């Protein structure tokens, strides 16, 4: 007889439960944070933290163990090259669960589970990300122009001061 799982059951059978946890972990590692039910977030936390610990180890055996659970090679590569080394000096506690209230349709309690040190990847493809990127580039371009104009005004001011000093020296 199979040993019962700790925590709430997440689906029909054990195979479906394993697939759901693997898919949730894949989404968490890909996006850095996901919105799901509290029960799924609580079941995902230890699962994801064990995978991050394997990612910190970084050897071939650990990579193969992770590949048995997460089938997306790009996500596994990201786990071992970016996420694992980021938590090098941290002993556990890689994820945070924040409760956000109940879902509108069925009143299910919802939560956001996220990696503690957020990924520093800009979002691509969304209009909001494109406008934020454009807005951040405009001040940089203006800032690039201002020192050049300021430098010419400073140079002319220094030249004027120098000519005044010469004029005063000649008068004395």
From Swiss-Prot:
Residues 132-143 have a biased composition (Low complexity). One of its GO terms (molecular function) is structural constituent of ribosome. Keywords: Ribonucleoprotein, Ribosomal protein. One of its GO terms (cellular component) is cytosolic large ribosomal subunit. One of its GO terms (biological process) is translation. Residues 123-172 are annotated as: Disordered. Part of the 50S ribosomal subunit. Contacts protein L32. Belongs to the bacterial ribosomal protein bL17 family. NCBIfam families: L17. This is Large ribosomal subunit protein bL17. The gene is rplQ.
């Amino acid at each position: 007889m199979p040993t019962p799982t700790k925590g709430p059951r997440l689906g029909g059978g054990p195979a479906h439960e394993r697939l759901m946890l693997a898919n949730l972990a894949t989404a968490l590692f890909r996006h850095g944070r996901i919105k799901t039910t509290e029960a799924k977030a609580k079941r995902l936390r230890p699962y994801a933290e064990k995978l991050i610990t394997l990612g910190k180890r970084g050897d071939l055996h650990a990579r193969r163990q992770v590949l048995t659970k997460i089938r997306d090679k790009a996500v596994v590569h990201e786990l071992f090259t970016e996420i694992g080394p980021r938590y090098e000096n941290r002993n556990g506690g890689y994820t945070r669960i924040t409760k956000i209230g109940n879902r509108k349709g069925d009143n299910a309690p919802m939560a956001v589970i996220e990696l503690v040190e957020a990924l520093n990847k800009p979002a691509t493809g969304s209009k909001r990300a494109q406008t934020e990127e454009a807005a951040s580039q405009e001040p940089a371009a203006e800032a690039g122009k201002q020192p050049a104009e300021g430098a010419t005004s400073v140079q002319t001011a220094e030249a004027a001061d120098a000519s005044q000093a010469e004029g005063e020296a000649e008068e004395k």
